[in-house]
Amino acid sequence: MQTQSTVEVRGKSLKVKVAVTNEGDESAYNVQIYVNENHRIKTSHVKRYLDIKESFEYESHYDLVQEKQGRYPLIIGVDYTDANEYPFTATAVTYYSFGSDTVPKIFGSAGDVKLTGYAKFPLKLRNMDEVTKEVHIYMITPKELSVQEKVREITLQPQSELTTIFDVNNLSALPGSRYQVFFILEYEDESKHYSSVIPCFINLDVLNSFFKKYKWYFIGGPSTLFIVFIVFQFLLQNSKQSKQGPLN
């Protein structure tokens, strides 16, 4: 599911337009778009059926209540199912500027992670400023994944680096799938608000998942064949002795 969004700010009014397109190889069902602005969530109506290459659009409006000018994050998601009612989620994160834009001095990096049932997801942060920063971190994932302590606060000393680790669990994500996840970093000074978004991917390990499910077939199969071979040799030896008869 491909998501595109545009944002427009006029004074204290925010308009968000979202368009989702079914780029998969089968139809999607029960499609619903949601927009999360500062924990205020608005949702579209449910579109029962979205054909391949078909698009679905939704527009939402917010009255902004921010006191400080700057850059703020905006979370966009799409819930849908396949023909068998199996649920899926697609997420995206963008931002809007209220008043004047800001350039953050906190930078982060995270690599892609392989996940079977559980994985640790390291996030490396760097403070380029000469002032200590109190940083709020949010990890945004699809609903198929769960995160322990997905919201946290850390203190970054001036011109320093720090690595924090998030624990991610697989709730219902399918083996072989690839999910985009995001880290949102936010902090403020006396007059401005700053935010940055770090995108990365979680890859569901299909080989490990397959082996885990069928490992006893791989382990037990050779053992069973070995036992059958021994029994066959024993019966063959007895058959030869019976044909030869007793020794004189």
Task: For every predicted segment, state its role.
Residues 1-5, 43-47, 107-110, 149-152:
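Surface-exposed, proline-enriched loop/turn segments that connect beta strands in immunoglobulin-like
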Residues 6-12, 112-117:
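Short, solvent-exposed loop/linker segments at the N-terminal edge
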Residues 8, 48-56, 154-163:
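Short proline/glycine- and polar residue-rich coil/turn motifs
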Residues 18, 76-78, 183:
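Hydrophobic/tyrosine-rich beta-strand signature of extracellular beta-sandwich/beta-rich modules
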Residues 21-41, 126-145:
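Short acidic, flexible loop segments centered on an aromatic residue
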Residues 63, 80-213:
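Membrane-proximal extracellular "stem/stalk" segments
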Residues 214-235:
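Selective detector of the "anchor" transmembrane alpha-helix that sits immediately C-terminal
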Residues 240-248:
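Cytoplasmic C-terminal tails of single-pass
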